Regions:
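RecB-family 4Fe-4S metal-dependent nuclease core
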Residues: 1-258
Length: 258
């Protein structure tokens, strides 16, 4: 299977694109249709990519990789990602050095609570599957696939400013889309687990398990088709009540929209 970077070179759907349209149709237009220039890049994006890179290496190498080595990977990737980011912006009371130390604490917590040393099947597994009715394949990448008891489980690593509410994972579109893709690719329904690490002075690690029924997977197909139909109809409008407006990379362009 080609890497997800290679898969992105051809027309495709992704969970991120679908979620973007649901969250704010106008943002979807700016990003995926207009290819508008990014006005600002929130620090959470290079931070998240570097954090994922570090945990991916930990999953690949296994128990022989020390916490210090995991943190070194994070530091290297974070530096590169920050240098490449367009108009990088930090939140109040936040800068490169404070985020670096936050990342170290979070990774130490993640390593101390690591539970998959002898269960990892695949790391950064890309996928490209067809969804009935869609004009393009659905692509993406599973962070990690493990054996969880008798079940196969997709693991997705998340950084978060706060602990997740109970039940959040059961409604998450990413888990639905990824479970659909896994079943389409491998012929079995997996469990799904979000490992949520909080950005805090004393980070916490919480595991949120969820699964999807056949009915929920069929509902995803209907949702995906409605999203594509809406986009093809040109239904783009701002959602100014969205939680992500504060860090939107197209905020200035949005203000000029009529």
């Amino acid at each position: 299977m080609e890497t997800v970077a290679k898969l992105r070179e051809t027309p495709h759907w992704s969970y991120s694109a679908m979620q973007c349209f649901i969250t704010c149709p106008l943002k979807y237009k700016f990003r995926y249709i207009d290819n508008a220039e990014v006005e600002r890049t929130g620090s959470c994006f290079p931070f998240g990519r570097a954090f994922h890179a570090a945990l991916s290496e930990r999953a690949r190498i296994g128990i022989d990789m020390s916490e210090r080595e995991v943190c070194d990977v994070f530091e290297d990737f974070f530096k590169v990602e920050c240098e490449a980011a367009q108009n990088l912006t930090y939140k109040q009371n936040e800068d490169y050095d404070t985020l670096l130390q936050t990342g170290f604490r979070m990774l130490e917590a993640a390593c101390e609570n690591w539970m998959d040393d002898y269960a990892v099947q695949r790391v950064a597994e890309s996928f490209s599957v067809n969804v009935p009715g869609l004009s393009k394949p659905l692509i993406g990448e599973f962070d990690c696939v493990v054996t969880d008891g008798k079940d196969t489980c997709i693991v997705d690593w998340k950084t978060s400013s706060a602990k997740w509410a109970v039940g959040k994972a059961d409604k998450d579109l990413q888990a639905t889309a990824f479970c659909y893709a896994f079943k389409a690719k491998h012929g079995e329904k997996p469990l799904f687990r979000f490992d949520v690490i909080t950005k805090a002075k004393s980070p916490t690690v919480n595991n949120h398990y969820t699964l999807r029924t056949d009915d929920e997977l069929n509902r995803f197909v209907s949702l995906a088709n409605q999203i594509e139909k809406s986009i093809n109809s040109g239904n783009f409008y701002p959602n100014e009540t969205g939680f992500s407006c504060g860090e939107c990379p197209y905020a200035d362009r949005c203000k000029k929209w009529r």
